Amino acid sequence: MAKTAILSNGNLNIGLNEFGLVSDFYFPDNGYENHTLGRDLFHRIGIKIGDEFSWLQNGDWQFSSEYFEDALISKTEAINNNLQIKITFTDFVVSDFDVFARKIRVQNLANYPREVQLFLHQNFAINSSFHLADTVQFLPLEDDEKAILHYRGKRAFIISAQKVGGDFNQKSFKDFDQHTVGLFGIEGKLGSWCDAEDGILSSSNVEHGQTDSVLGFNFSLGVFESADFQYSISCADDHQLALTNFQKMRDEGFSKALSETKKSWQKWLAPALRFSKKLDLKYQKKFIQSLMLVKSHLAKTGAPIASNDSEMLNYARDDYSYCWPRDALFAIWPLIRLGYRDEPQRFFTFCKNSLTPGGFMMHKYLPNGELGPSWHPYSQGGETRNLPIQIDESAGILFLFAQYYKKFRDNSILDEFYDDLVKPIADFLVDFCGENNLPKPNYELWEMDFLSTTYSTSVVFAALYSASNLAQQLNRARDAKKWRDQALKIRTSAQNELFNPENNYFYRGIWPNGEKDSKIDASSFYGAFIFNLFDFKGEKLHRAFNVLEKRFNVDSQIGLPRFESDVYYRFSDDYEANIWPITTLWRAEFYIARGEILKAKEILDWVSDQQTSTGILPEQIDPRDLKHLSVAPLTWSQAEYVSALLDLIASEE
């Protein structure tokens, strides 16, 4: 199920699916331990009127979604014309404590009064696992308050729901009328949600195993009348803290939490809003939405998570809830350009703590810094040995740190990270270059092949050249000379070895046997351009760009694929490859650099049109029908959109 909104405070991350239902539930860290596990494990919402019952996902509802202006607070409208009912959700994750909250309004669209029932269902696989039993209990609390507790060990989720009555001056709050708890996925049980369909919940008070629960409200609606409800899930790794958070949200605490969350986002967005005002009006909203989506994927450790969309678990063995240093470069870079200091600095601390003793980053990481799973082997077969790494990931971190220093000129930060991050990586990159002065074969940007690519060479060049400038700032003359000398050797060798005069494009790379790969790969051009491996004023970059556009027929299709014959998520042989927003935006960035703003805006407009109403961009787009493919949102796609618009602002200034 594609995501329509992401809500997060860095600890708690909620993904809402196309029906506005909770389908990803990460806690206590962004991207780590999804307690709904994707797949069919989502929280249901149902309405019963008379003899008719409808769950929101059953196909009878029409949906629209949007974010609040300048806050990661979503609004979803669901209309059922057959039932003549509308439900409006206002959803948010509280900014300063770990609660998912939603305001619910149920409106009668009929010109006659109705008796209505609202059912709110939740299920969890706590700690992302079915291996051990969860417990669910009905909680009868003091002062006639009621709640539902789901827990495993210390981890607790407390669910509360109230009907809101009264007027503006004196509101009243009434807890749910019905409840039940039960099992799903074992012993032939589908789930306690089935119990709601007859309108009467069985009031079961405890269960353990694979557990779920349902809350129910019974209420009347006059002609065109509405009823309001508030619902929350309070989360903690301590049962008492979960109760404390639950109490904070009771009664008037809900409105306060919504107000404070909105203020918190507006404060964080203040630097970005100043930039957005310099854009054409048509880009401003999408710019801010994309930036909020990037922020929503930053773990509390500082690690940018590639995507928290777990939909692909329906088809694949794993998801994207990891930190790839490759993606992190492009996620953090626009934050630096916008003037954000804290998030990049936390990420550099994450990198310093994750860096191997050899001075390189591994393939990918869990949000807490532990090593993530990898498909890169230590050997290419036979007696060969190699590191299971992508050299661009280590180089990218070094380049990014140099951009941070260039922006803020903070010598205390340079002192803090020089010996533990800058120098180890730079020395490793020098040692990793072969006799031809290019990086030795390694796993390339797209994580598939083992060779020395133009893209990786570009990042290593830029990283070493930037590192030499950092060394000069600290009067480390020996380091500065060593790193600059190697950078210049790389550039000279690249000029001789990596441009293919036969097709006027960059070689994708050089294989371990010395053979050169002529495949047209968008990253070869982009790396040479953005990391200044080839002179922007020279002919080769511009000739290569023309070849890239002609090869992928941009006159009839604005979007670019990654490379020729890309089969990843390609579901038919009747077309060559899917479109990637990332590579498409690279086209726009080059046009901006050339001063061809109208052409750049044509591309930016096309990418903007592919965004959802909440600004979400996927990893890939089917060129036949423009449907989103793979994960959505992809943090890199959102960040690249922000970066392209920042380029546009810079060009027009």
Task: Give the ranges of each region predicted by the language model.
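Beta-strand-rich interaction surfaces with strong enrichment in secreted/lumenal proteins
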Residues: 89-92, 203-206, 215-221
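Well-ordered alpha-helical scaffold segments within catalytic/enzyme domains
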Residues: 270-281, 292-296, 329-342, 382, ...
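Short Pro-Gly-centered flexible turn/kink motifs
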Residues: 65, 114, 219-239
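Non-catalytic C-terminal accessory modules of carbohydrate-active enzymes
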Residues: 30-31, 35, 40-41, 48-87, ...
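Polysaccharide-binding surfaces and accessory modules of carbohydrate-active proteins
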Residues: 1, 77-79, 83-194, 213-215, ...
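Extended glycan-interaction surfaces of carbohydrate-active proteins
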Residues: 71-73, 237, 271-322, 357-389, ...
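An extended acidic
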Residues: 1-81, 157-195, 260-286
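Extended, well-ordered alpha-helical scaffold segments
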Residues: 243-264, 282-289, 339-356, 411-429, ...
